[in-house]
């Protein structure tokens, strides 16, 4: 049977299609297979390594100082790099980061609970720095690639949706299956009553090593199969080329309303959802006494995102990204309010009420999740529209920095709050007082509501690229680029 001829676009590239979407999804699956374990870091060091809440909270803040240096510098380095690589610039950086994730992911979960406080602190900081640097090396160029795969707004929205799908798939193993194998039931030896659950730290280490290896496989699939249709070496070199200025780029980012709005929404999402992970694990182990179900419950809560997948392009075409995502944030607000009820109802109703609130939250967040990365791609175009430079790597890396800052500061605050309500690390999850257990329930509910509020403010009030403005921006940018090509 004759092979179907390869269809090419007007520039000679393979036409955009399903292979691009699957490959791009595989990239975020790779990122999340390893870094999806981040939600387990605090639980591992708090419950298994028995690190004091105050010390762990401080260490989490310290490693964010590394983020402050790490993200923008790597983004600027990629923007300024004009060397020619066999795989291409972005794919080469992604490959290096993918290798580093195998080592770094395991390093942060070295199981030495008997070590002294100083050694524990050193192990935590070194392991986390290696892991975080590798993630940034892979994730910054990966995120920037969305605007290089296609220039079509609808196709970018599809890529953003598939990225979210890849992220969800990649997060399922560490987020859902891992809790089922790393917790063990603890019973009273005299009465046989179930007291709660304890963490099996050795299994976390081997799981992290395995996740890093699987992530590498996903990254290699993406590197080999995706096609970049926009020149990744678009920043010209030579005497007439504008010099790259990190300070100016940061100033432009702050003045870039779409980038700021999308970043605030993302920070809110991570401050709520990611921060809730530690309190959620402790709550499920101590309150519901079913920690192995925590990941499964989270999956059920966020499955509604998949409802929007087949319709996201139609929703975007009809209403616009901002308009559709804003409506979703209102539904998330309702879910957050419902979740405030579960600590007040009888135990028999607590889990169902929690689930209703979580499903509403996930349903509302579904649209935003599907288009969030396409919105950042639009923000990069906005940077070019308003300031004359795209600066993909820097805009994306600053967005990534603030996201990761939220991921780091949030858990640090949550751990400090757990200490404030009386959590005693040496008692694990089985010996905490009832006040601490109920306090963790209120903490989880409050974090989800806070997350929904931030998403509404970021997308509904700050992000200013509605459907009409986006069309105007795209038209003007296309005219500029056409004029520049004629001038050359």
Indicate where each model-derived feature is located.
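Membrane-embedded alpha-helical bundles of multi-pass transporters/translocases
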Residues: 2-488
């Amino acid at each position: 049977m004759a092979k179907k001829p390869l269809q090419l676009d007007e520039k000679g590239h393979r036409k955009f299609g399903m292979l691009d979407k699957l490959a791009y999804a595989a990239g975020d699956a790779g990122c999340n297979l390893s870094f999806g374990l981040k939600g387990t870091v605090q639980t591992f060091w708090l419950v298994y390594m028995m690190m004091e809440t105050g010390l762990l909270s401080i260490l989490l803040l310290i490693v964010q100082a590394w983020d402050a240096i790490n993200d923008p510098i790597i983004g600027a380095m990629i923007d300024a790099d004009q060397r020619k690589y066999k795989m291409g610039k972005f794919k080469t950086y992604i490959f290096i980061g993918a290798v580093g994730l195998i080592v770094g992911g395991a390093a942060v979960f070295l199981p030495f609970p008997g070590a002294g406080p100083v050694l524990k602190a050193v192990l935590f900081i070194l392991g986390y720095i290696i892991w975080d640097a590798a993630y940034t090396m892979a994730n910054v160029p990966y995120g920037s690639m969305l605007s290089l795969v296609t220039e079509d707004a609808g196709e970018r929205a599809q890529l953003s949706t598939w990225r979210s799908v890849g992220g969800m798939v990649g997060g399922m193993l560490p987020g859902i299956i891992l809790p089922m194998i790393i917790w063990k039931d603890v019973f009273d030896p005299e009465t046989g009553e179930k007291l709660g659950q304890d963490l099996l730290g050795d299994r976390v280490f081997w799981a992290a090593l395995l996740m890093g290896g699987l992530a590498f496989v996903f990254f290699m699939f993406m590197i080999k199969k995706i096609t970049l249709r926009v020149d990744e070496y678009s920043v010209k070199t030579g005497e007439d080329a504008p010099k790259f200025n990190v300070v100016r780029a940061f100033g432009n980012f702050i003045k870039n309303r779409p980038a700021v709005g999308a970043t605030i929404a993302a920070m809110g999402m991570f401050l709520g959802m990611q921060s809730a992970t530690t309190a959620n694990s402790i709550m499920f182990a101590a309150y519901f006494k079913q920690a192995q179900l925590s990941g499964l419950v989270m999956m059920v809560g966020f499955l509604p995102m998949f409802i929007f997948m087949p319709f996201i392009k139609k929703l975007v075409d009809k209403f616009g990204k901002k308009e559709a995502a804003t409506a979703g944030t209102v539904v998330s607000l309702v879910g957050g309010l419902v979740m405030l009820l579960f600590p007040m109802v009888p135990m028999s109703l607590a889990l169902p009420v929690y689930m209703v609130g979580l499903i509403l939250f996930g349903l509302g967040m579904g649209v935003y999740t599907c288009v969030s990365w396409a919105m950042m791609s639009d923000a990069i175009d906005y940077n070019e529209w308003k300031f004359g430079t795209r600066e993909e790597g820097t805009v994306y890396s600053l967005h990534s920095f603030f996201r990761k800052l939220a991921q780091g500061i949030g858990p640090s605050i949550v751990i400090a709050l757990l200490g404030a309500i009386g959590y005693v690390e040496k008692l694990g999850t089985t010996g905490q007082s009832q006040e601490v257990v109920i306090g963790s329930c209120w903490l989880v509910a409050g974090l989800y509501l806070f997350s929904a509020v931030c998403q509404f403010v970021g997308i509904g009030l700050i992000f200013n690229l509605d459907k009409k403005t986006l069309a105007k921006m795209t038209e003007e940018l296309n005219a500029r680029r056409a004029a520049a090509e004629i001038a050359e």
